[in-house]
Regions:
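Conserved C-terminal structural/oligomerization subdomain of aldehyde/semialdehyde dehydrogenase
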Residues: 1-109
């Protein structure tokens, strides 16, 4: 179960020797939808969370509810792109600039 992407209340406990090995083990997968880091030192937990390759990473708890304005999505084989809020709009649109000259030209020729 450790190497598969599962959806449900599942916990895999793997013993590691320190934060660097924990990050290496966490990133050693083809998936990357969601992750979690638990620790007493919030600043250290946040630094570790930033090093994990996932679309979402929680510190000291799972998602309690989805928030529509947050950019939801994974990385690697867990998906491409984000949906939700401005990030979702940006992911599925292409910004363009189109102009139309309707009157006399602004600059003389």
């Amino acid at each position: 179960i450790y190497g598969e992407e599962s959806f449900g209340p599942v916990v895999c406990v793997v013993r590691v020797n320190g934060a660097d090995e924990a990050v290496r083990v966490a990133n050693d997968t083809e998936y990357g939808l969601s992750a979690a880091v638990f620790g007493r030192d919030i600043a250290r937990a946040l630094e570790i969370a930033k090093r994990i390759d996932s679309g979402i990473c929680h510190v000291n708890g799972p998602t309690v509810h989805d928030e529509a304005q947050m950019p939801f999505g994974g990385v690697k084989a867990s998906g491409y792109g984000r949906f939700g809020g401005k990030a979702g709009i940006a992911e599925f649109t292409e910004l363009r600039w189109i102009t139309i000259e309707t009157g006399p030209q602004h600059y003389p020729i």
